[in-house]
């Protein structure tokens, strides 16, 4: 799935066929390894690049106020990224991505390392995002909370689109066995 995202974004070249890009697409990409973060810079400098104010949805915001939306205190915002936990780095990457103008948000396993507060924040931000979100996630409950359409790779080159999230796909006749998933009580979303 990550390879497919990289192919679609031009990070990998296909071995056959072509990938055709749309026009006027501004992509923000959340990679599960968080490569877009500069570990030596502070949280503030990763987002604002030396500025005190940043433009968010056409409005000027003080960077500390904006980072507060992503649960960073002013003191923590001055911390080098290398000192942050995995969850804090994920929050920072989200803050950085949502500070850039984009109409296509690509998320590769965005819920890895997230605490409950950050997961709720991510859900809220995604629900208000004014664009298209393309996401790879194994977090079925998260998908049920935020997606309106699901692409399912059903094997033998078949990809189908279903309205809604994981539970909606099951109600529409989807089978976890089709995906090689064993559904146990503990694996089911609650």
Regions found by a protein language model. Name each.
Residues 1-190:
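ABC ATP-binding cassette signature C-motif
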């Amino acid at each position: 799935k990550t390879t497919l995202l990289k192919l679609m974004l031009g990070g990998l070249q296909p071995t056959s066929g072509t990938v055709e890009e749309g026009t006027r697409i501004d992509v923000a990409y959340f990679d599960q390894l968080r490569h877009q973060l500069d570990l030596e810079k502070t949280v503030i400098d990763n987002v604002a690049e030396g500025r005190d104010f940043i433009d968010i949805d056409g409005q000027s915001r003080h960077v500390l106020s904006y980072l507060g939306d992503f649960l960073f205190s002013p003191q923590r915002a001055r911390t080098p990224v290398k000192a942050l936990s995995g969850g804090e780095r994920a929050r920072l990457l989200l803050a950085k991505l949502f500070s850039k103008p984009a109409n296509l948000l690509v998320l590769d396993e965005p819920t890895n390392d997230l605490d409950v507060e950050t997961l709720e924040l991510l859900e809220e931000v995604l629900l208000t995002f004014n664009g298209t979100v393309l996401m790879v996630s194994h977090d079925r409950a998260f998908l049920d909370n935020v997606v309106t359409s699901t692409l399912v790779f059903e094997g033998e080159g078949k990809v189908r689109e279903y309205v809604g999230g994981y539970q909606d796909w099951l109600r529409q006749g989807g089978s976890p066995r089709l995906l090689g998933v064993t559904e146990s009580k503990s694996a089911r979303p609650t």
